[in-house]
């Protein structure tokens, strides 16, 4: 079920509902300098013709920084979705949803650009991205 992929992490979808599609504006939950980003691509997601690719908790996305420090603005970077408003079901039967959507800016190898993550992150994202989980304050 889980396979080693190009980005150096084990990919396993857990059946997470995808709550963020291409074009969504999402706040950034770390201190990398970016405040708000727009999702421009979801790597390795194949979908039907003319359907927008979407991402869920734990997915890697390509984003464009829209608001933030002058050094970060207008850059195209990778990010990991750590929170989403749309409810998703865990294997034990519980449903989880957060108050907001949020991403964490990462390098292509999965190391976070910031040194701390504000707010909780989902357990699915923490298991899939251990380096992001290391700087998180709370895992739900």
UniProtKB/Swiss-Prot annotation:
GO terms for biological process: translation. CDD domains: Ribosomal_uL14. Gene3D superfamilies: Ribosomal protein L14. Keywords: Ribonucleoprotein, Ribosomal protein, RNA-binding, rRNA-binding. GO terms for molecular function: large ribosomal subunit rRNA binding; structural constituent of ribosome. SMART domains: Ribosomal_L14. GO terms for cellular component: cytosolic large ribosomal subunit. The keyword DNA-binding does not apply. It comes from the Archaea. PROSITE patterns: RIBOSOMAL_L14. Binds to 23S rRNA. Forms part of two intersubunit bridges in the 70S ribosome. PANTHER family: 50S/60S RIBOSOMAL PROTEIN L14/L23 (PTHR11761), LARGE RIBOSOMAL SUBUNIT PROTEIN UL14 (PTHR11761:SF8). Part of the 50S ribosomal subunit. Forms a cluster with proteins L3 and L24e, part of which may contact the 16S rRNA in 2 intersubunit bridges. HAMAP family: Ribosomal_uL14 (MF_01367). Belongs to the universal ribosomal protein uL14 family. This is Large ribosomal subunit protein uL14. The gene is rpl14.
């Amino acid at each position: 079920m889980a396979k080693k992929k190009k980005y150096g992490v084990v990919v396993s979808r857990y059946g997470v509902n995808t709550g963020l599609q291409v074009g969504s504006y999402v706040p950034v939950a770390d201190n990398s300098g970016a405040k708000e980003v727009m999702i421009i691509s979801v790597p390795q997601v194949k979908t039907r013709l003319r359907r927008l690719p979407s991402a869920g908790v734990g997915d890697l996305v390509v984003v464009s920084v829209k608001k933030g420090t002058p050094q970060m603005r207008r850059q195209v970077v990778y990010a990991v979705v750590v929170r989403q408003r749309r409810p998703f079901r865990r294997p034990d039967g519980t449903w989880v949803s957060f108050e907001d959507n949020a991403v964490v800016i990462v390098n292509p190898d999965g190391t976070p650009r910031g040194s701390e993550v504000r707010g909780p992150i989902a357990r699915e994202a923490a298991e899939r991205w251990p380096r992001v989980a290391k700087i998180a304050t709370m895992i739900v």
